[in-house]
């Protein structure tokens, strides 16, 4: 009789990508695989080829909002839905990639006495995973320092995990996609899965100067492309899907937010990166800590947006390119492979199911 695994996680692409990597591995091994996500979350559009079950979710906010009064009831409803769904599905194990949708699933798993393994993509535990941790059998971490107060029996450091498609990127295909007229280094600018207005505005203020030395690929986010800008060597996209691995491989240097998924892929590809993390006022501070860790390891240059002018931004980009070989050399020292991390998680899941 085949085993059953449920995956959960969502809210941002970073809380889905690890599941997209793992799902085919379990399908290949003959497991029955299903997914639990939110009704309208990004995970619904990203997860394919498995049965998708939606449950009610409430967003876990750290700021005042009237929805904070409604969301506890949504979470309670989601717990009941998760409990019934897990009871009906009878999974052998559940794997959670975090995000607010995972909280009711973790509680539902505990009530059904089904083991749940949670994975934290960032350098500190997110609120959802903090809530889920007491119900979890194992915690898999991306950074070695994550969960310092969690017992070694429960915590396992597995390192960054990236999509296998990233390995298959082709530089020539990326060049054909962009059709740049001049042979210059390529600067890729990414603002995360939601885009980043601050980065978009800063880049556009500096375009004239940066284009003297670089071709620019700018991933702006949905609804954030500026059609009035038609400068040679500057290409804007709301989002890049299947072509992204080719674009990443083509890029000489990258400017990015400091979400774990993005910077893990850049580390895997050995791409020198200028990280501009979300500020503590805009998030729980995880991106700042991610960026600081990469900076300490010598993988990235970091600037904080509340201390940046157009001149300092331009200087940071030029400095990154000038010193790119130093960053590549430092990243070559990172020895943990993608396959190693994937197999480590699979082994943990198999061990828990025994």
Curated annotation (Swiss-Prot):
GO cellular component, one term: plasma membrane
Compartment annotation: Cell membrane
Entries under SUPFAM superfamilies matching the protein: UDP-Glycosyltransferase/glycogen phosphorylase
GO-annotated molecular function: glycosyltransferase activity; UDP-N-acetyl-D-glucosamine:N-acetylmuramoyl-L-alanyl-D-glutamyl-meso-2,6-diaminopimelyl-D-alanyl-D-alanine-diphosphoundecaprenol 4-beta-N-acetylglucosaminlytransferase activity; undecaprenyldiphospho-muramoylpentapeptide beta-N-acetylglucosaminyltransferase activity
Catalysed conversion reaction: di-trans,octa-cis-undecaprenyl diphospho-N-acetyl-alpha-D-muramoyl-L-alanyl-D-glutamyl-meso-2,6-diaminopimeloyl-D-alanyl-D-alanine + UDP-N-acetyl-alpha-D-glucosamine = di-trans,octa-cis-undecaprenyl diphospho-[N-acetyl-alpha-D-glucosaminyl-(1->4)]-N-acetyl-alpha-D-muramoyl-L-alanyl-D-glutamyl-meso-2,6-diaminopimeloyl-D-alanyl-D-alanine + UDP + H(+)
Chief place of localization: membrane
Recorded metabolic or biological pathway in which this protein acts: Cell wall biogenesis; peptidoglycan biosynthesis
The protein's enzyme class: transferase
Residues at which UDP-N-acetyl-alpha-D-glucosamine binds: 12-14, 163, 193, 287
Stored CDD domains: GT28_MurG (cd03785)
The keyword Endoplasmic reticulum is assigned to this record: no
Keywords: Cell cycle, Cell division, Cell membrane, Cell shape, Cell wall biogenesis/degradation, Glycosyltransferase, Membrane, Peptidoglycan synthesis, Transferase
Membrane topology category: Peripheral membrane protein
The enzyme's E.C. designation: 2.4.1.227
Family: Belongs to the glycosyltransferase 28 family. MurG subfamily.
Functional description taken from the UniProt entry: Cell wall formation. Catalyzes the transfer of a GlcNAc subunit on undecaprenyl-pyrophosphoryl-MurNAc-pentapeptide (lipid intermediate I) to form undecaprenyl-pyrophosphoryl-MurNAc-(pentapeptide)GlcNAc (lipid intermediate II).
Protein name, per record: UDP-N-acetylglucosamine--N-acetylmuramyl-(pentapeptide) pyrophosphoryl-undecaprenol N-acetylglucosamine transferase 3
Organism of derivation: Bacillus cereus (strain ATCC 14579 / DSM 31 / CCUG 7414 / JCM 2152 / NBRC 15305 / NCIMB 9373 / NCTC 2599 / NRRL B-3711)
Gene name of the record: murG3
């Amino acid at each position: 009789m085949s085993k059953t695994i449920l995956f959960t996680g969502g809210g941002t692409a970073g809380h889905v990508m690890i599941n997209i990597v793992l799902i085919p591995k379990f399908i290949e091994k003959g497991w029955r695989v299903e997914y639990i996500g939110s009704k309208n979350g990004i995970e619904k559009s990203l997860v394919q080829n498995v049965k998708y079950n939606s449950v009610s979710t409430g967003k876990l906010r750290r700021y005042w909002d009237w929805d904070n009064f409604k969301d506890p009831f949504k979470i309670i409803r989601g717990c009941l839905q998760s409990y019934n769904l897990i009871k009906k599905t009878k999974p052998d194990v559940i794997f959670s990639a975090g995000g607010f949708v995972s909280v009711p699933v973790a509680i539902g798993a505990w009530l059904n006495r089904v083991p749940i393994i949670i994975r934290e993509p960032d350098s500190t535990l997110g609120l959802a995973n903090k809530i889920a941790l007491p119900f979890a059998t194992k915690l898999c971490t991306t950074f070695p320092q994550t969960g310092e107060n969690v017992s070694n029996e429960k915590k396992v450091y597995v390192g960054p995990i990236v999509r296998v498609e990233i390995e298959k990127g082709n530089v020539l295909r990326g060049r054909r996609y962009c059709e740049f007229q001049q042979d210059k280094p390529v600067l890729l600018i990414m603002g995360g899965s939601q885009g980043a207005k601050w980065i978009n505005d800063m880049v556009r203020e500096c375009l004239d100067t940066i284009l003297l030395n670089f071709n620019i690929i700018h991933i702006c986010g949905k609804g954030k492309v500026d059609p009035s800008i038609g400068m040679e060597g500057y290409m804007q996209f709301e989002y890049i899907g299947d072509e992204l691995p080719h674009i990443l491989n083509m890029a000489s240097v990258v400017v990015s937010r400091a979400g774990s998924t993005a910077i893990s892929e850049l580390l895997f590809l050995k791409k020198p990166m200028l990280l501009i993390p979300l500020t503590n006022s805009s998030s729980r501070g995880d991106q700042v800590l991610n960026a600081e860790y990469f900076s300490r390891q010598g993988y990235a240059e970091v600037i904080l947006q509340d201390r940046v002018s157009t001149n300092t931004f331009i200087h940071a980009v030029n400095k990154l390119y000038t010193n790119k070989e130093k960053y590549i050399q430092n990243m070559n020292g990172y020895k943990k492979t993608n396959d190693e991390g994937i197999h480590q998680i699979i082994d943990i899941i198999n061990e828990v199911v025994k």
